[in-house]
Amino acid sequence: MPSFDIVSEIDMQEVRNAVENATRDLSTRWDFRNVPASFELNEKSQSIKVASESDFQVQQLVDILREKLVKRGIEGGALEIPEEMEHSGKTYSVEAKLKQGIETTLAKQLIKLIKDSKLKVQAQIQGEQVRVTGKARDDLQGVMALIRGGNLGQPFQFTNFRD
């Protein structure tokens, strides 16, 4: 019986490369000359700290970071940026979290979306991934298209496709 897994994973090496590219880009931009601005990747907490002198500059830095992440093959939805910025002294900063893994509530939404589509497939939660099985390969491809089209606020990948 054909099956595949729905996962949400981020390649941390690509994130590291994107942060390095953003830092390199920052050093060549004239609007950030003589401005203490930085990107800091914390791999343990899977977050990126963006800091600068003003909130407008922090927004520009976040846009640069998103652009570099997309160029490295990481979707922009994988970055969760809070609305409120931290302000301490002369520095504004924001701690952007990387979304990785499928939480239980999101997995339940995925399963509900699949069941509401009336396709002849079964979906089950397995840790931080969802396994989808069905009799026809076409039904599984329909589920893939459905998940790509559904805006669930997180990028998904399809792995372990078995026939």
Swiss-Prot record:
What's in the keyword line of the UniProt record?
A: Nucleotide-binding
Repeat in keyword set: no
Q: What's a single GO CC term here?
A: cytosol
Alphabetized CDD domains for the sequence: YajQ_like
Statement: the UniProt record of this protein carries the keyword Nucleotide-binding: yes
One Pfam family matching this protein: DUF520
Q: Which GO terms describe its molecular function?
A: nucleotide binding
- Stretches of the chain forming a coiled coil according to its record: none
Q: Which family does it belong to?
A: Belongs to the YajQ family.
NCBIfam families named among the record's database cross-references: PRK05412.1
- Job description of the protein: Nucleotide-binding protein.
Official protein name in the record = Nucleotide-binding protein ECA1137
Q: Which organism is it from?
A: Pectobacterium atrosepticum (strain SCRI 1043 / ATCC BAA-672)
